[in-house]
Amino acid sequence: MENKYNLTREQNVFVAKRNIVNYIWNSATLEGIKVTYPETQAIYDGGIVNGLTVDNIIAINNLKYAWQFILETEDIECDYKLLCHIHKLVADKLVLDTDLGKIRTTPVNIGGTSFKPQFPIESQIKEELVEILNQEEKTKTEIAIESMLYIMRRQMFIDGNKRVAMLFANKIMIDNGCGIITIAKEYQEEFYTKLIKYYESGNMLELKNFIYTYCIDGINL
């Protein structure tokens, strides 16, 4: 799986900033938040939007702050510590303070499937994450996608796992000039179908190829 884009970090940040509202909108709709692009733009700009719940507005603002962190911090290693920090940004004011950036201690259910994620063990997650991130034979794009899907299926946090997973993966992508992973609205239904299949089987190959083919944004220079 080759890198689709070969940008400098500066170029990749430029692409991300130019399309940031669209990426936030895609993430919000992926989570089932019924928000329009203009509403997302208004929230991003600090405006008032009627018709959305307070939690939905908080979720969108949290995505904004998390993206800003990803784009503005270059010299931070992609590891378990960063993963937990991203969760603090994504889930702020949406979960109990005691759950922010912490491994969940209660069961979670996933809609659309009978799959039950096992309880996360911190030492095991750290070890598994290191193994994924240090695959020298694979490109950074493939490592980013695999880490994202691993985090999604592991469901290590009480809430916000997909958002955390995608932001973590995009930190890898951007730092290495590989573009941006984003699930556009027209691909979300198929993405979810393949995601459920992956949850139940544990085999990520089909979903990984789908994301690589349809869900990486960037520019060719």
Predicted regions, residues:
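FIC/Doc superfamily catalytic core
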Residues: 1-221
